[in-house]
Amino acid sequence: MEELYQRFIASAGICTDTRKIVPNSIYFALKGASFDGNAFAAEALNKGATLAVIDNPAYQIDERTLLVPNVLLALQELANYHRRTLKTLIIGITGSNGKTTTKELIKSVLSEAMQVVATEGNLNNAIGVPLTL
């Protein structure tokens, strides 16, 4: 994880969508119900990503692809590793209803006095939270 973290620190950020690749970013090949992000690893690298994190060896191209057992888990572990380096207050919100509204209200109030980072919209899930971190 340390090696991936050092590459993350030196990168322009993380991307999971090849349509939004920026130069020097790291592409995480997430899978969805109707797509396999591994299939887009070469495209991500061609568009300027410096690293593609994949979990299918069939898509391993060269040293610019990092093969991991599970891409989503690698993204979550990277976010957790990064979070542990931060010296900041973290607020978690749980419940069945109203989490996004509560998050937006807290963000609005706290941003009057301090710098605030929060997930966009309702991306309060296994992908949105790591991407926010």
Per-region residue spans from a language model:
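N-terminal leader/targeting and accessory segments in enzymes
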Residues: M1-E77, Y81
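Phosphate-binding loop of NTP-binding sites
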Residues: A74-L133
